[in-house]
């Protein structure tokens, strides 16, 4: 898989560049670089799935598990991270500019779409009624609920709040918790997919 290898090297280079310059970066530059890195990782995941044929998998369970790994969960994790960072800055400044409001609304809309797709994938996996999928389904629903609640906080405390009063650290912490719950589902999905693929060997 030479193309995936090249993309992996690009990701490693970008990450090492961030590590070397982290202490000297401004907050906006650091945020932009981390966002670019996440985008590269997402592209690497999808490209690797395409090269191995997993995105065309004929078995429904592994197909929807792969969708969780390559599409829905990365989109939710990245979207929540953007909302967490931007929202934290807005609450700290006490001002919501039109540009940032538009960015937050777009991220929220994309997250809503990813949540719908996530629940559809979990629903299809649940239809198979496999005992080994139980934890994934439970944690997946919890993560979806956490992110949905976070989007609600964004709407109530930032987008439609005239006088913002929420503690920025509290908003950031809730976002971190939502990301952690989605990351846990990601790891469970990866483990489940590995087990499924091993069963075919």
Please annotate each region the language model reported:
Residues 1-201:
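Hydrophobic alpha-helical segments
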């Amino acid at each position: 898989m030479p193309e995936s290898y090249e993309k992996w090297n690009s990701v490693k280079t970008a990450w090492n560049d961030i590590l070397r310059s982290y202490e000297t970066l401004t907050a906006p530059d650091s945020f932009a670089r981390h966002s670019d890195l996440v985008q590269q990782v997402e592209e690497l995941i999808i490209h690797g799935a395409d090269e191995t044929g997993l995105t065309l998998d004929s078995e429904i369970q592994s197909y929807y598990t792969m969708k969780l790994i390559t599409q829905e969960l990365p989109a939710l994790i990245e979207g929540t991270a953007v909302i967490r960072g931007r929202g934290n800055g807005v609450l700290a400044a006490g001002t919501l500019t039109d540009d940032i409001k538009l960015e937050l609304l777009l991220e929220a809309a994309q997250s809503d779409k990813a949540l719908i797709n996530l629940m559809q994938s979990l629903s299809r996996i649940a239809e198979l009624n496999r005992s080994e999928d139980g934890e994934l389904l439970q944690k997946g629903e919890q993560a979806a609920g956490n992110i949905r609640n976070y989007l609600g906080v964004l709407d109530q405390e930032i987008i439609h709040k005239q006088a913002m009063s929420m503690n920025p650290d509290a908003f950031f912490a809730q976002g971190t918790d939502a990301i952690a719950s989605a990351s846990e589902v990601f790891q469970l999905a990866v483990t489940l997919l590995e087990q499924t693929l091993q069963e075919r060997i």
